[in-house]
Amino acid sequence: GFNENLLNDAINLALNSETLWPYDLGAANNIPGLTDIEPEPWNRILGPLKPRGGPSGLLVYKGYIAAKWGDPTRVDMTFSIAKSYFSVLTGIAVQDGLIDSVDTPVATTLRDKTVSSYFRSDQNRGITWEHLLHQTSEWEGTLFDKPDQVDHFREVGPGSINTRKGSKRKLQKPGTFWEYNDVRVNLLGLALLSLFKRPLSDVLRERVMAPIGASDTWSWHGYENSWVDIDGEQMQSVPGGTHWGGGIQISTFDHARFGLLVHRRG
């Protein structure tokens, strides 16, 4: 069991640690700490933004809900947690034989000429799936009007200083340098789309979310300019976050189901 007083202290800490971000990012037309410090046109919002609610959360212990606060059924934007969904989808691609190994170069895996063109340069042809997953790809290029340079020198976490963010730096060999770069993460999403040849939200719903009993309230939004031709059909590539809008909008309950799946190793 839990110490009720300590449990209540933890819940109160969560309730009192609400973000200072505006409730309506669409009205603000920027993402604090990201697009508000980026120059035009790199800072342009490309995907939908949804007004947020207050703090909500769950404490799950041994598969049971031990505590909850706020409204865990409310659907909110959830930013970089989308990267975890990319990881699981990559695992499914390996399981289905679409990727031989995460150590395989992406360039040798993709059959779509348009998508594979992003990996043809000397800098990019040695990038593996693991590099994309670990954010060590050092990919160079522009995707959906966003250059990789926009996140050069980006810092994340408490105490981050981003005065150099977006300044050009010398690229390293893929696999040797880590950088939190959303353009490169979004490239992983496009590469997965070209493998599955289906919208990633459809694959996620069919292979993961429906089997674990998730609701039908979640959605995964792309950018206005992220539509691509896959075997003659227009499909929208989705991002691994909400840096420029879009991304996964989902409830706390559904996130918890997904988290429990990962905790139990699938």
Where are these regions (language model features)?
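Solvent-exposed, acidic/flexible segments
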Residues: 4-7, 52-53, 75-82, 99, ...
